[in-house]
Amino acid sequence: SGSCSLKTCWLQLAEFRKVGDHLKECYDGAVAMRLGRRRTLELRNSRLNPPSADDLVYLQTSPDYCTRNARTGSLGTVGRACNKTSAGMDGCELMCCGRGYDQFKATVVERCHCKF
């Protein structure tokens, strides 16, 4: 028969969450560098392996996100609610930055407009 088949390929972005997770993983493994005498990047710690073309590198350390800093606009984490059972970013271990945290129980009464 004289039928044709058509195949179309296109690039598509990954899910936003996957992109964010990948960037966070790269950020956590970023390699500290310094500007050398010849204005080239050098490892700050010569005992580490040089970064690959896919690695993130940095010249300045990140600000301390735990404490308030008006210059950078960081509000810090003091007074924020954390999740005691989470190992993620909302977990008390990370969010409280080693300062410890207060625990409390709260009972919330809400109208749920339930129908039986």
UniProtKB/Swiss-Prot annotation:
Q: Matching Pfam families, A to Z?
A: wnt
Q: According to the Swiss-Prot or TrEMBL entry, at which residues is a lipid covalently attached (O-palmitoleoyl serine)? A: 1
Coiled-coil ranges from the UniProt annotation: none
Question: Its domain of life?
Answer: Eukaryota
Q: Please name the GO terms that the record assigns under molecular function.
A: cytokine activity; frizzled binding
User: Where does it reside?
Assistant: Secreted, Extracellular space, Extracellular matrix
Posttranslational modification, per the record? Answer: Palmitoleoylation is required for efficient binding to frizzled receptors. Depalmitoleoylation leads to Wnt signaling pathway inhibition.
Among InterPro entries, the record links this protein to: Wnt, Wnt_C
Q: Does the keyword Membrane apply?
A: no
Q: What GO terms fall under cellular component here?
A: extracellular space
List the keywords (alphabetical): Developmental protein, Disulfide bond, Extracellular matrix, Glycoprotein, Lipoprotein, Secreted, Wnt signaling pathway
* Disulfide bridge partners, by residue number: 82-97
- The primary location reported for this protein is secreted
Q: Which residues are glycosylated?
A: 83
Single Gene Ontology BP annotation = cell fate commitment
Provide the function of this protein: Ligand for members of the frizzled family of seven transmembrane receptors. Probable developmental protein. May be a signaling molecule which affects the development of discrete regions of tissues. Is likely to signal over only few cell diameters.
* PANTHER family xrefs: PROTEIN WNT-5, WNT RELATED
Q: Which family does it belong to?
A: Belongs to the Wnt family.
Q: What is this protein's name?
A: Protein Wnt-5(II)
Species the sequence originates in: Eptatretus stoutii
Q: What is the lineage of its organism?
A: Eukaryota, Metazoa, Chordata, Craniata, Vertebrata
